[in-house]
């Protein structure tokens, strides 16, 4: 235990017998043994307590690791749940208005298509009627014919716009436009 050999123990006993005497030596040996037992017991208890503390600290560290992993997983799940809710909300909130807008646009497209077809049939009817009944009557164009002529032309630059205005004024005096405006005004009345 202390690195003491047999020879050294014999030397210590001889010195103790001479110093203490034969009467006090047995009591001193008992006291020394009790002292070493108490020191050994105290050291064992300290070691045991130290080991328990180490185990507790390891358990605490493991518990903290588990706690951290659980918290991170819970945070991930709550984020995923929030994202799923947002996706559902955004998908539902976007698909319904888009579907309604699509339906409205398709109805408007059908209305525009039918209006276009009716205008095409009116124009073809008027052009066929104008080809069958030629007239030589010239009159001053009305405001509605000017609006039609200007609305149908789209000049690209200033020179084209001047030329197109001159040609539209000349075309307004033509007999076919005058007849078409007169026939459309008679239909309206």
From Swiss-Prot:
Chain positions covered by the region annotation Disordered: 152-189
Alphabetical UniProt keywords: Cell inner membrane, Cell membrane, Membrane, Protein transport, Translocation, Transmembrane, Transmembrane helix, Transport
GO biological process, one term: protein transport by the Tat complex
Residue spans of biased composition, Polar residues class: 153-189
Topology within the bilayer: Single-pass membrane protein
Alphabetized InterPro entries for the sequence: TatB (IPR018448)
Bilayer-crossing regions: 1-21
UniProt GO molecular function: protein transmembrane transporter activity
Highest taxon in the source lineage: Bacteria
Gene3D superfamilies reported for this sequence: 1.20.5.3310
Record localization: Cell inner membrane
GO CC, one annotated term: TAT protein transport complex
Function: Part of the twin-arginine translocation (Tat) system that transports large folded proteins containing a characteristic twin-arginine motif in their signal peptide across membranes. Together with TatC, TatB is part of a receptor directly interacting with Tat signal peptides. TatB may form an oligomeric binding site that transiently accommodates folded Tat precursor proteins before their translocation.
Assembly behavior: The Tat system comprises two distinct complexes: a TatABC complex, containing multiple copies of TatA, TatB and TatC subunits, and a separate TatA complex, containing only TatA subunits. Substrates initially bind to the TatABC complex, which probably triggers association of the separate TatA complex to form the active translocon.
Similarity annotation: Belongs to the TatB family.
Protein name, as recorded: Sec-independent protein translocase protein TatB
UniProt source species: Helicobacter hepaticus (strain ATCC 51449 / 3B1)
Lineage: Bacteria, Pseudomonadati, Campylobacterota, Epsilonproteobacteria, Campylobacterales
């Amino acid at each position: 235990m202390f690195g003491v050999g047999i020879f050294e123990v014999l030397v210590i006993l001889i010195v103790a017998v001479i110093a203490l005497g034969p009467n006090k030596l047995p009591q001193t040996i008992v006291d020394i043994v009790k002292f070493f037992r108490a020191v050994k017991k105290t050291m064992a208890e300290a070691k045991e307590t130290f080991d328990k503390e180490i185990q507790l600290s390891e358990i605490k560290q493991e518990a903290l690791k588990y706690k951290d992993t659980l918290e991170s997983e819970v945070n991930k799940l709550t984020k995923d749940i929030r994202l799923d809710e947002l996706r559902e909300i955004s998908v539902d909130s976007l698909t319904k208005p888009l579907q309604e807008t699509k339906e409205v646009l398709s109805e408007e497209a059908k209305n525009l298509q039918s209006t276009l077809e009716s205008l095409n049939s009116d124009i073809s009817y008027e052009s066929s009627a104008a080809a069958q009944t030629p007239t030589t009557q010239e009159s001053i164009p009305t405001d509605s014919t000017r609006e039609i002529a200007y609305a149908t032309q789209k000049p690209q630059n200033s020179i084209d716009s001047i030329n197109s205005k001159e040609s539209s004024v000349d075309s307004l005096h033509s007999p076919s436009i005058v007849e078409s405006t007169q026939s459309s005004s008679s239909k309206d009345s």
